[in-house]
From Swiss-Prot:
Quaternary structure annotation from Swiss-Prot or TrEMBL: Monomer. Interacts with PqqE.
Xref: NCBIfam families: PQQ_PqqD (TIGR03859), PRK02079.1 (NF002535)
Record-stated family: Belongs to the PqqD family.
Domain of life: Bacteria
Keyword Cell wall biogenesis/degradation recorded: no
Name of the featured protein: PqqA binding protein
Key words, A-Z: PQQ biosynthesis
InterPro entries for the chain: PQQD, PqqD_bac, PqqD_sf
Gene3D superfamilies documented for this protein: Coenzyme PQQ synthesis protein D (PqqD)
Gene name of the record: pqqD
Pathway as given in its UniProt record: Cofactor biosynthesis; pyrroloquinoline quinone biosynthesis
Length: 92
């Protein structure tokens, strides 16, 4: 995954707030995965148009006290891709 990679939810997967879980979850055909606040903040920005660099920039602006989230965001998005929650493609 590169910072120029564009990430999107896979077909059948979606992020939503689950009141019963009191957290955001990824819903998918086989079940769901409960997310922590950090994971939810990252995935809320995944829209199929933004690249990884744009997501990082938005999070750095939103959470300046974090002191730079670049590596953490890339690592999490790689895990989300390995879990098959999202897809990753290079721009055309």
């Amino acid at each position: 995954m590169q910072k120029t990679s564009i990430v999107a939810f896979r077909r059948g997967y979606r992020l939503q707030w689950e009141a019963a879980q009191e957290s955001h979850v990824i819903l998918y055909p086989e079940g769901m995965a409960k997310l922590n606040e950090t994971a939810a903040a990252i995935l809320e920005l995944v829209d199929g148009r933004r690249d990884v660099a744009a997501i990082i920039a938005m999070l750095n602006e939103r959470f300046p006290e974090a002191g730079g989230v670049d590596d953490d965001v890339v690592e999490f998005l790689q895990i989300a891709c390995q879990q098959k929650w999202i897809t990753c493609r290079e721009p055309e």
